[in-house]
């Protein structure tokens, strides 16, 4: 079975998630899995493609249920949890991931946003805290512009919001990225637009003053603060171009066509990590890695083949 065929099966299996009014129950998923396994033993290509598509459909539904589990289960009661801070404004807004709940590890860790209270001591990304939480699911109310906050929160892997009742630090050390950003912020301090520079370059929007955020939103330039796939792809292109230009000064035996490709992907992955590895950046890194592997395989791939594999 060709890799592009598998890619088409993945796309067809995941697509119904966009139009389903509600997720099927466990019994339905069990029946579909059994039915797909039976179809897989029929020696007809088309039937096996249908079986593979059904299996990917079940996998997509299970992944969706896993994302919604936190909002359906953890709300209401007070939860004893261990939270890793992934971003903070240093004051009352903190982004984190619940790594342990009631003493048991959770994987994948659901994300949450804590509002309205200062932590007992200075906070930075990378710290691990023991907290008593009161959380709720993000509401899906639409505003005048048609923006679905719940869909956006789920896409960002942050389905929960709430506050903490008690908090004590377990691991006070900051992550390497947080230490670098603190150093960069100190370097940019003399500049009037230091918060905007940090937001445009590193995607750190929490430190941008509210007045500037309002101006950027009203002028339609707020999206520039988000590190998108375009930024990551441009970083890969720039790095690959510099490496290719530097090969002019190397001996002929040291010049390989793979070097700019691998170097560009590595630089893109590093920049994505430096900007927080947000879902859009992560998806771009994965797509670049798939494209790189296709190129390194030595086969001739059409644009459609590459597009299908990256999309899947």
Residues covered by each model-derived region:
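N-terminal leader/targeting segments
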Residues: 1-74, 161-163, 283, 300
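Generic recognition of cysteine residues
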Residues: 9-12, 37, 124, 174, ...
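Membrane-interface helix/helix-cap signal primarily in integral membrane proteins
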Residues: 54-223
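Alpha-helix capping and helix-coil boundary motifs
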Residues: 42-46, 148, 175, 190, ...
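Helix N-cap and loop-to-helix transition residues
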Residues: 21-25, 190, 209, 256, ...
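Hydrophobic alpha-helical transmembrane segments in multi-pass membrane proteins
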Residues: 5, 47-50, 162, 214-312
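Short, electropositive, low-hydrophobicity segments enriched in small/polar residues
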Residues: 17, 203, 207, 233, ...
């Amino acid at each position: 079975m060709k890799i592009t065929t598998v890619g088409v099966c993945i796309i067809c299996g995941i697509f119904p998630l966009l139009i389903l009014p509600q997720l099927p129950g466990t019994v339905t998923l069990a029946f579909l899995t059994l039915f797909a396994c039976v179809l897989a033993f029929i020696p007809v290509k088309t039937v096996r493609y249908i079986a593979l598509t059904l299996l990917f459909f079940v996998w997509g539904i299970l992944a969706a249920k896993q994302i919604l589990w936190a909002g359906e289960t953890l709300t209401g009661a007070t939860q004893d949890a261990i939270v890793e801070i992934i971003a903070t404004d240093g004051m009352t807004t903190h982004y984190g991931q619940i790594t342990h709940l009631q003493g048991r590890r959770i994987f994948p860790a659901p994300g949450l946003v804590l509002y309205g209270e200062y932590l007992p001591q200075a906070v930075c990304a990378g710290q691990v805290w023991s907290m008593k939480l009161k959380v709720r699911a993000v509401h899906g109310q639409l505003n005048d512009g048609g923006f679905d906050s719940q869909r956006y929160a789920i896409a960002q892997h942050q389905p929960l919001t709430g506050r903490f009742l008690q908090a004590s630090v377990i691991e006070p050390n900051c992550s390497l990225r947080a230490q670098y950003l603190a150093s960069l912020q100190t370097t940019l301090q003399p500049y009037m637009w230091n918060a905007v520079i940090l937001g445009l370059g590193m995607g750190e929007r929490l430190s941008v003053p509210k007045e500037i955020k309002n101006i950027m939103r009203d002028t339609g330039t707020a999206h520039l603060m988000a590190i998108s796939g375009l930024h990551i792809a441009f970083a890969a292109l720039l790095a690959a171009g510099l490496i290719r230009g530097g090969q002019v000064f190397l001996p002929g035996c040291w010049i390989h066509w793979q070097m700019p490709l691998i170097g560009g992907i590595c630089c893109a992955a590093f920049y994505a990590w430096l900007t927080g590895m947000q879902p859009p950046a992560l998806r771009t890194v994965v797509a670049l890695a798939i494209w790189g592997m296709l190129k390194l395989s030595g086969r001739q791939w059409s644009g459609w083949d590459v597009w299908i594999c990256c999309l899947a």
